[in-house]
């Protein structure tokens, strides 16, 4: 009788199958933590705005619901003035940021200028400077009485006077320090743009200016708008620059008004 060899297959446990629940568990834990850190403070802020009492100390009661706080804010002339100043400062700063950021992007991407790497680094350098430091630095340079630029101009006999403790001063500093947002968006759009489109326009007889106006600019316009919106929103939340440059001139924006 011939002996027949039989093989026995043993199914080993699939470690990967056993650990499939780990990503879901970590995702769920992360969602819970983020919900607590974000949703809970936001909910308490909303409840506090809709009640006339402190919900943390006195508890939350439906009878305390009121829009009185919103009416006080809406009818406060100081809030309206601060809001108007914020829109002017941030709107003007956004325009300056677009001019500077677009110029830097065009020079870096579309020209053969030397030291392009240095220029590209300078284009994002303001992002590494805290707003409060930026305000103090420019106040040292542009103070109306003791500013370094004014003192140098006085010694040189140049009829030059600069005062950054003004609305144009804030707009100027805002534009310089938040131009990198426009620069990064626009430079990326210029690099990723299909050059054959501009070549086709030139072959068709379009001038460089017409090609820029009808081909290049429409293609990078979404990037410019994205940089503008981001710059504007970030400027609205900045405290350092308005506190240093606006407060001495009694120019109050929303961020400084909240802290006063």
Residue ranges and their predicted role:
Residues 2-9, 194-195, 210, 247-255:
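Feature of multi-pass inner-membrane transport and sensor proteins
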Residues 63-66, 186-199, 208, 221, ...:
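Transmembrane helix boundary and interhelical loop/hinge segments in multi-pass membrane proteins
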């Amino acid at each position: 009788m011939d002996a027949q060899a039989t093989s026995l297959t043993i199914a080993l446990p699939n470690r990967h199958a056993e650990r499939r629940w780990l990503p879901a568990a970590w995702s769920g834990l992360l969602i819970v933590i983020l919900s607590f850190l974000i949703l809970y403070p936001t909910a308490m802020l909303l409840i506090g705005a809709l009640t006339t009492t402190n919900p943390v100390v006195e508890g939350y009661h439906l009878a305390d619901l009121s829009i009185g706080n919103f009416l006080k804010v809406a009818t406060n002339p100081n809030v309206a003035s601060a809001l108007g100043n914020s829109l002017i400062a941030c709107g003007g700063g956004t325009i300056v940021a677009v001019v500077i950021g677009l110029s830097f992007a065009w020079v870096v991407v579309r020209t053969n200028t030397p030291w392009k790497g240095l220029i590209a680094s300078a284009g994002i350098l303001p992002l590494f400077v805290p707003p409060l430091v930026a305000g103090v630095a420019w106040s040292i340079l542009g103070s109306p009485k003791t500013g370094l630029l004014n003192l140098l101009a006085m010694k040189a006999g140049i009829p030059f006077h600069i005062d950054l403790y003004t609305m144009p001063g804030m707009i100027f500093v805002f534009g310089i320090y938040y131009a990198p947002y426009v620069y990064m968006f626009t430079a990326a759009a210029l690099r990723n743009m299909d050059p054959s489109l501009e070549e086709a326009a030139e072959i068709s007889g379009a001038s460089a200016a017409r090609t820029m106006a009808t081909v290049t600019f429409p293609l990078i316009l979404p990037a410019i708008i994205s940089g503008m919106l981001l710059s504007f929103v970030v400027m609205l939340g900045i405290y350092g620059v308005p506190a240093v440059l606006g407060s001495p001139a009694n120019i109050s924006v929303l961020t400084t008004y909240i802290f006063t």
